[in-house]
Amino acid sequence: MNVEQIVEAIEKLTVAELAELVKALEEKFGVSAAAPIAVAAAAAPAAGAQQAQAEEKTEFDVLLKGFGSNKIGVIKVVREITGLGLKEAKDLVEKAGSPDAIVKSGIPKNEAEDIKKKLEEAGAEVTLK
């Protein structure tokens, strides 16, 4: 496999696959690839570059869009996550669908996904922003 074939293979990778490749190369060779990530994103198609920017986001807000038929269950999970009192959690859940229905903001992606999963298991409709 020559260099051109390697480049062609890399061009076909998704943004997630590129991130995985970078991590593997960093571990294998003990280097940091901060600059090459930007180069790889610039070489990607416009849609891929937009996905890269979305994936580079480090802080997320968890927005409550709805509570379904299990309002009490959702309130309990909101209280557990936020530490709010019963009335405050109830008020937050009742704001579902409005821009003010932020359960938690400025948190890392993995924590935001965990919170989203817990809320969805309780019957809530949730989005990450």
UniProtKB/Swiss-Prot annotation:
Q: Which residues form a coiled coil?
A: none
Which GO terms fall under molecular function for this chain's record? mRNA binding; structural constituent of ribosome
Any one GO BP annotation for this protein: translation
Please verify whether the record's keywords include Oxidoreductase. no
- InterPro entries named in the record: Ribosomal_bL12 (IPR000206), Ribosomal_bL12_C (IPR013823), Ribosomal_bL12_C/ClpS-like (IPR014719), Ribosomal_bL12_oligo (IPR008932), Ribosomal_bL12_oligo_N_sf (IPR036235)
User: Which Gene Ontology CC terms are recorded?
Assistant: cytosolic large ribosomal subunit
KW Transit peptide (keyword) present: no
Tell me which Pfam families the record gives.
Answer: Ribosomal_L12, Ribosomal_L12_N
Q: Which NCBIfam families match?
A: L12 (TIGR00855)
Full protein name:
Large ribosomal subunit protein bL12
Name its species. Answer: Pseudothermotoga lettingae (strain ATCC BAA-301 / DSM 14385 / NBRC 107922 / TMO) (Thermotoga lettingae)
